Amino acid sequence: MTSYDLVVIGSGPGGYVAAVKAAQNGKKTAVIERNQIGGTCLNVGCIPSKSYIQHAHWVLAGQEAAKFGFAKQEVSFEFPKLVARKDQVVKKLQGGIHGLFKANRVDYIEGEASFENGKLMVNGKEIGYQDLLLATGSSPFVPPINGVDQADYLTTDTFFKQTEFPKQLTIIGGGVIAVELAFAMRPLGSEVTLIEVAPDILLTEDEEARKVVKSQLQKMGIKIYTQAKITEVKKDAVVLDEVVVPFEKLLVATGRRADLTLAKQLGLELDERQRFVKVDCHYQTSQPHVYAIGDLVGGYQLAHAASAEGLCAVAAICDKDKHTLDQTSIPRCLYTQPEVASFGLSLEQAKERYENVQVKKMAFASNGKAIASEETNGFVKIIIEGKYQQILGAVIVGAHATEMIHTILAVKESEGTIDEIARMVFAHPTLSETISDVAKSF
C-alpha cells in the first residue's frame, strides 16, 4: 500500500493549489482525479467561458470601430475553429498544472476514489494517508421542470462540447454563468433569450450594477424574462404563462450542487440543510485530519475562493502560517461588457453592522481615458465606515473592472483606509483615476 502525508481528492483550483503548497512545505502529496485535470473551472467553467467571451469582445470591437470611420465588415466565422481555440487554451493550462505537479513531486493519480470500510480505494488499490483534503466540487443542478427530462438540453458541463453554433439559444437561469454565456453568444449572431424565475437577473450583484448590465444586454438584443413561470419544456420550446419561447439549443444554467458522495461515505457532518460539508475556520470537517474546501463547503462558489480555502487548510495541516479566510476580501467578478467586480459588504449589509456608514459613487462618464476609449458606461462605488475610514466594500462597473477592483481590495486587505487611496498618485489618463476621485470625495 502506498501512503502519503496528504491526499487531495479533486484537481480543481482548490485541490491542485493546495497540493502544490503542501508539497512545497515538505509533505508527500498525491492528487486523485476521476475526470480531467483542472476541474470544472478549467475544463467547463471559468476558462472556456472567458475564451468564448473574448470572441464576443472581438466582434463588438469591430462594430464599435465602424461608428467612427472604420470600414464596416460583415462578421463571418467558423465555429469549430472557435471551439478549437478554446480547447487549445484549456490544453495549455492543463499542461501547466501537470508541470507544477512534476516540479513539486506531487503524484497525480487518475481514477475514481471511494471509501470502503473506512479505507481509501482507487482503481482497486488502497491508498494510505495522514491527512485528507476533499475538493470534489459540484455538478449542475437541473430543477424539476415539467418536460425538461424529455428535452435535449445542455448544462454548463456539456455546453462547451458543442461544435455546432446555436443559432437560437434559450437559457433557463439568470445567474453569472447564464448571463456570461448569453453575452458571449449574442455578438456572434445567436438569438438569445434568458428565462429567470426570480424577480431579476444577477440577484447576488449590486442593484445599480445589475441595472447597467441588464440594460446593456437588452440593447444587444437579448430577450430577458424575469419572474417567469415555466409551465412546460417541449422539444423545441419553453412554455411560459404568457409566451412560448422557441429554441434550437436549450441551456439549463440554474446553479450547481455540491458532490457529497465521498463526504457521505465518510460520515462527515453536513450543514442544517444537508447541502454542504460543515467545516471550521481552518476547513477541518467533523473528523480529525479530514478537510473540505470549495463548492463542497458553500460560501462563494468561486475558483479563487476554493484556492484560498485550500491554502488555509494546508496551513493548518502543516501547522505553518496558520490563518483564517476573510470572506469580505474575496472579489466577485462578472465578465460581460461592461464588467462588474465587487468585494465586501453591500450598503444594506454595512448599515446592519456599523453605525456610521458612508458611500460615494462616481461615473466613468467624466474620466478622460474612458471618454477617449469609448468606455464610459459604468461607475465606481466605495462603502466605508466613517469614524475610522475603514473600507467595507466596493463595486466597479465598467471596462476592466475585474482588474481594477484589486486596487481597492489591496488597501482594504492591508487594513488601510480610504484616505490612503486618496493620497495615492494615480497615472493619467487611466480608468483607475475614478477610484482616486471617489476616495477624495469622502
What are these regions (language model features)?
Residues V7-I9, A113, I127-G137, I172, ...:
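Short hydrophobic core segments
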Residues T2-S3, V20-K27, I32-F165, A198-L202, ...:
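Glycine-rich flavin
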